[in-house]
């Protein structure tokens, strides 16, 4: 499975940034943008752009910081706020989306093995965003006492709303804090400026509002990268961070490091 929407390649971060830049530039001063990572037809964002393995929590927070300090009206797709991942289905019968069955036949008729075809479906199928919400660690993730329309993702004993609510440093509580801060800083009406739009590893931008300037710095890779900031960081305070990397004009970001800095207007 090497082409089309089912192929999983190296993240084209430059293309992602250019898409955001295009819509913000087009609407600046005349309209209002919507910002969101995904919807019911796309893979779970922490599996698609992040890392749902060793860096699950860290990359989920990185994705939170990166998107939701941009101007516009923010939309969170259910499950994103607790770091829900793609499904872990092992059999074709576990899927429900009709597209899956057609594509499976296409894959295998072209020589793909069952496991290769299944991995492509686990990576990209629309059902990834349609599995039952994971409320707690009880049967069927607390979603229902009946049999759900499709299987619950197997990591629900670890990734669920109850566990997230009980942990003050969880992804869920970070979402709540960030959205309160969006309101306080007037993020929705800000002016967006990217640094190094062509860079394919880091995501750096400022958002200037009536309250001050927000600076977001994020590493989208599972390896360290070096960044040199074009904005003088000395007047900024660190407000959010998922890492221990000290802020500096030039710094090495560890995998999925992200930080949000703020300079208050006097």
Protein language model regions, located:
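Active-site and adjacent substrate-binding regions of carbohydrate-active enzymes
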Residues: 1-266
């Amino acid at each position: 499975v090497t082409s089309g929407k089912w192929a999983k390649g190296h993240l084209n971060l430059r293309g992602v940034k250019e898409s955001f830049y295009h819509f913000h530039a087009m609407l600046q001063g005349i309209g209002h943008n919507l910002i969101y990572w995904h919807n019911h037809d796309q893979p779970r964002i922490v599996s698609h752009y992040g890392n749902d393995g060793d860096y699950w929590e860290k990359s989920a927070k990185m994705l939170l910081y990166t998107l939701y300090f941009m101007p516009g009206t923010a939309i969170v797709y259910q499950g994103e706020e607790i770091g829900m991942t793609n499904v872990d289905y092992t059999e074709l019968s576990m899927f429900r989306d009709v597209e899956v069955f057609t594509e499976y036949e296409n894959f295998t008729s072209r020589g793909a093995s069952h496991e290769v075809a299944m991995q492509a479906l686990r990576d990209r199928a629309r059902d990834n965003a349609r599995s039952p919400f994971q409320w707690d660690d009880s049967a069927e993730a607390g979603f229902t006492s009946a049999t759900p329309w499709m299987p619950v993702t197997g990591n629900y004993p670890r990734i669920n709303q109850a566990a997230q609510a009980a942990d003050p440093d969880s992804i869920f509580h970070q979402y709540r804090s960030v959205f309160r801060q969006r309101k306080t800083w007037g993020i929705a009406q800000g002016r967006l400026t990217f640094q190094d739009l062509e860079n394919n590893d880091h995501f750096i931008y400022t958002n200037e509002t009536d309250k001050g300037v927000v600076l977001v710095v994020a590493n989208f890779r599972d390896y360290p990268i070096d960044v040199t900031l074009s904005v003088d960081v000395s007047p900024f305070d660190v407000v959010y961070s998922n890492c221990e990397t000290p802020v500096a004009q030039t710094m090495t970001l560890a995998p999925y490091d992200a930080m949000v800095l703020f300079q208050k207007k006097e």
